[in-house]
Amino acid sequence: MAKVSMRDMLQAGVHFGHQTRYWNPKMKSYIFGARSKVHIINLEKTVPMFDDAMNFISSVAAKKGKVLFVGTKRAASEAVKEAAERCDQFYVNHRWLGGMLTNWKTVRQSIKRLKDLETQSQDGTFDKLTKKEALMRTREMEKLEKSLGGIKNMGGLPDVLFVVDADHEHIAIKEANNLGIPVVSIVDTNSNPDGVDYVIPGNDDAIRAVQLYLNAAADTVLEARAQDIVVQAEQDGFVEAE
């Protein structure tokens, strides 16, 4: 499991919350105080809660479970995609389409359409179309790729959501709650922690902080998967020669 120290968090600005006037009283127990009208998050609480969250992600990944990274705001979008791809998992980093989890049947049809269009673009079908028709299909493919590209190979519902901003992604969290899918989320001082199974109190705006969380989550998945391979090899009786 990837470890993140308090020093790492301080350097990334994890402790800086939102302006005090925007606070959510449900986050009171995680707030250390205020400085220049900005809430300061108590990292003595964040560090162990982050460890708990990573432990849970590790247990899911070790059982070959699917992790869905969700972060659609600009500060998180690119980092979410990079982290998910690095650990061979899944992501939504543009717009969360309502029903992405709760209406999976329909989403699956859209994914099938995306894959059909990708095949057509590669097997020469587009070349046989009129310029206008080819352009229309290319645009449709790009639009579908933008919203579904990160989940097109997920092959079913995820086993856990890793959310960067609980407030911004409240629809995703609600859908996961309805389906009983556990949620791990960064929750800032302006957000509501309800519906989050593993709360990580922290700054959800600073790019360095967002990258810190995502890198640790990706490392945790990779380590758990590698450990699983070692255990599997031992069970199968493979022993390296001296």
From Swiss-Prot:
GO molecular function: structural constituent of ribosome
GO biological process: translation
Pfam families, sorted: Ribosomal_S2
The organism's place on the tree of life at top rank: Bacteria
Gene Ontology CC terms: cytosolic small ribosomal subunit
Entry annotated with the keyword Transmembrane helix: no
UniProt keywords, alphabetically: Ribonucleoprotein, Ribosomal protein
PANTHER family from the UniProt entry: 30S RIBOSOMAL PROTEIN S2 PROKARYOTIC AND ORGANELLAR, SMALL RIBOSOMAL SUBUNIT PROTEIN US2M
Similarity section: Belongs to the universal ribosomal protein uS2 family.
Protein name: Small ribosomal subunit protein uS2
